[in-house]
Amino acid sequence: MKLSLSPPPYADAPVVVLISGLGGSGSYWLQQLAVLEQEYQVVCYDQRGTGNNPDTLAEDYSIAQMAAELHQALVAAGIEHYAVVGHALGALVGMQLALDYPASVTVLISVNGWLRINAHTRRCFQVRERLLYSGGAQAWVEAQPLFLYPADWMAARAPRLEAEDALALAHFQGKNNLLRRLNALKRADFSHHADRIRCPVQIICASDDLLVPTACSSELHAALPDSQKMVMPYGGHACNVTDPETFNALLLNGLASLLHHREAAL
């Protein structure tokens, strides 16, 4: 699996791995790269079955497989220890990594994640699946911003959204791959295992997230033994895209604090 690695800003700089959500594209983190690369070696990638890592995914494709293939790619690149920043599905992969490779994951940042899918989130995905079956890739892509962004943010950026729709349609991961990745997301359940995660965790959520209620992050916070929760008042599901200044400040402070906390505990 292909990874994109930034040059380390100094010798032995900590590694931060960015894992996007259901869309799977490493470009999702574009507005975080410049600030992170000043302090960390940053790894981003297109998830298997998407972008520059094309593949046909098995029907039983799982979050555990997503975690294993990423860890194997990191080890092959010479990376043994890394912090994880995961958004939604990416946060699930991050938790799986922390469970399966505890000696490797130093810190976990969960952005609009959850322990198990909430009934509201499941309903949103059911609607989106119906759109996919009835209207194909174009209907899925055109509806996606409604679940990602605040209404006023979208209204002020109509030309940008039209360009993003065209790009997303051109690079659509394919109906079968999308549904198999979505099914992996829906099957994931960390409610009985989260208390085994021992690395420090920062939980970031947005109070106006239409797709994932903030209660999901509260449940995560209660279940994770070494976690802190930060709530952004604005930004929607893709809060790192819509309000990068606020998000980046939380992310940078969280990474620095938790990495220091971990080193002090060793």
Swiss-Prot record:
Molecular function GO terms recorded: hydrolase activity, acting on carbon-nitrogen (but not peptide) bonds, in linear amides
Catalytic activity: carbamate + 2 H(+) = NH4(+) + CO2
Class of the enzyme per the UniProt entry, highest EC level: hydrolase
One biological process term in Gene Ontology: uracil catabolic process
Key words, A-Z: Hydrolase
Tree of life domain: Bacteria
Gene3D superfamilies (UniProt xref): alpha/beta hydrolase
Induction / repression: Up-regulated by the nitrogen regulatory protein C (NtrC also called GlnG) and repressed by RutR.
SUPFAM superfamilies documented for this protein: alpha/beta-Hydrolases
Any matching Pfam family: Abhydrolase_1
Annotated EC: 3.5.1.-
InterPro entries (UniProt xref): AB_hydrolase_1 (IPR000073), AB_hydrolase_fold (IPR029058), AB_hydrolase_sf (IPR050266), Pyrimidine_utilisation_RutD (IPR019913)
Keyword Hydrolase in record: yes
UniProt keyword annotation of Cell cycle present: no
Function per UniProt: Involved in pyrimidine catabolism. May facilitate the hydrolysis of carbamate, a reaction that can also occur spontaneously.
Family as reported in the entry's similarity comment: Belongs to the AB hydrolase superfamily. Hydrolase RutD family.
NCBIfam families found in the cross-reference section: RutD
PANTHER family documented for this protein: MONOACYLGLYCEROL LIPASE
Descriptive protein name: Putative carbamate hydrolase RutD
Gene: rutD
